[in-house]
Amino acid sequence: MNRRLGSTEAIYYLLDTLYCLNFVVFVEMDGTLERANLDRALQAAQQEKPLLRARIAQVDGHPFFEAVPMEQAPLKAQVQTLRNWRLRLAEQLDTPFTGEAPLARFFWFGGRGGQSVAAMVFHHAIADGKSGAQVLVDALRRAGGEDLPVTLQAARPSAQDLDPINSKGVVESTVQKLGFWLGQGRATLKFAQQLPGYDPQLQAQRSIKAIPYTVSKEKGRALLAACRAHDTTVHGVLGAAQILAINSECGAPEERHLALNSLADLRGVLRDNLSADDLGLYIATLTTVHAVGASPDLWQLAKSIKSELSSLLHSGDANLIHSFYPRASLLPTSRHSARLVQAAAALGPPASMLTNIGNLQPLTLRNGVPIRSLAFMVSPPPQHPICVTVAGYAGGLHLHLLYDQTKLGDAQAQRIGNALIGFIDAAIDPSNPSEKP
C-alpha cells in the first residue's frame, strides 16, 4: 500500500486541509443487526481493502499512503440512537479526519420499531461514492449472515498511473493534453453565469446542510423510459433539470450560458478493468458549459450534457482535468499549496455540481432484513452554490441537495431543489411543459 498519492488523490487531500471534503454513504433498513457481527464484517473489509488500514504520512514533505497494522487502527461500529440521524450525518461532512488510520468511520443508528440506518464516512482521498457504497453493502451482507469469502485485494495504483495516455509516445500524449486544455479554454470563453449574488470564495466558517428528495420507483422507471426515448441518460436529464433550476434564479428569461460540474466515474476508461469493488478515487470533475435559451428545452439540454460528457470520457481526456497538478513536481503539503490548488480549481467556469453513483438492485440481507434505500452525500466545494448527489436504488432515485448555509440562504436552496424536482416531474409527464417546474 505504501505509495505516493496520485494527482487526483493529492488534490483532494490538499483541499481537505482547507475545508473538509468527506463523503458519507448510508442505507435505511427495516430491521437490526448485532454490533459484534458488524465489527466482524468491518474487520473483513479492512482485511480485503488496503486503503481501509492506511494512513496518510508525510515523506519529504509530500503525502504518501502508508500501511498500518489492523490491530493498531481497527474500524469499529459507532452505535447511536436513530433520533436526528440525518443531522448527525450532515455534521460528519464537516468533521475532518486527522490523516491517521482508519480513514473511514462506521455508524449504526438504531431505534424502536425495528428501523435503523447504517452509514460509512470516508476521507475522499481513499474512495469515491461508487466504491464507498460497495464497501458498505458488502459489510452489511456479511453482518446479515452471508458468508462472503474474504479475499485480499492488492492495493491499486492511482487513476493517473492507470491512464492509457501513459502508454502513448511523448508527442502523441502531448498533443492529446494540448487539445484537452484548448477545449477547456474554449469552454471558459463561453462565460458561464454564476448564480446571482453567490460568492464562490472560501469562507473561514462553513455550515453544511442537506435537503433530501426521493423519486419513487414508478417515477424512476418512467424517467428511465423517457430518457431512452429521447436518446439521453438519467444523468443528462438530471443535469438539465439542475441547470434549469439554477436558470430560474437568474432573473428574466433570456439567452445565457450555464455550466454543470459532473463527477464522472473513470473505471470504464482506465486500465486494469476496475470495478466498484476496487476501493479508490477513480473519478474526474468535468465541467460542461451549455447555452440556455429564453424558452429552454429540457430534452435538448439533456442530450447536450450526455454528448459532451461522453465525448470527454471516450476520447480518454477525462482524467486530464487533474493534470494541472504535475506528478513530477508535487507541491509540498502546506496551507499555501492548498490555496494554490483551490485557486486553480476555481479558475473553471462557475457551475453547480452533480454527482451520480448509478443504480443498485434491491437487497434483502441473509437474516431477512430488507434495505429500503441507499443514498450518499458529499461536502460541497466552496465554488459551487449547490451540490446534488444521486443514488439509484431498486428503480427509485435518492437525491440530496447540499449547500453551505453561510453562503446560500435556506429559502433559496429549497426553492432551487423544488424547481429541480419539478423539472424531473415534467420530464416524466409529457403533458407538462419542460420549461417550467
PLM segments and residue spans:
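Short, well-ordered loop/turn elements at secondary-structure boundaries
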Residues: 113-115, 228-229, 348
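Acyl-thioester-dependent acyl-group transfer interface
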Residues: 1-60, 80-104, 248-437
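ATP-dependent carboxylate/phosphate-activation module, predominantly the ATP-grasp catalytic core
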Residues: 66-67, 212, 355
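Amphipathic repeat-derived elements
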Residues: 112-117, 121-123, 128-134, 138-141, ...
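Acyl activation and transfer enzymes in specialized metabolism, enriched
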Residues: 30-50, 120-137, 212-254, 399, ...
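Acyl-thioester-dependent condensation/acyltransferase catalytic cores
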Residues: 39-137, 141-145
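Short, solvent-exposed coil/turn linker segments
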Residues: 69, 74-81, 96-98, 151-166, ...
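Non-catalytic, low-complexity flexible loops and terminal extensions
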Residues: 1-9, 13, 113, 126-134, ...
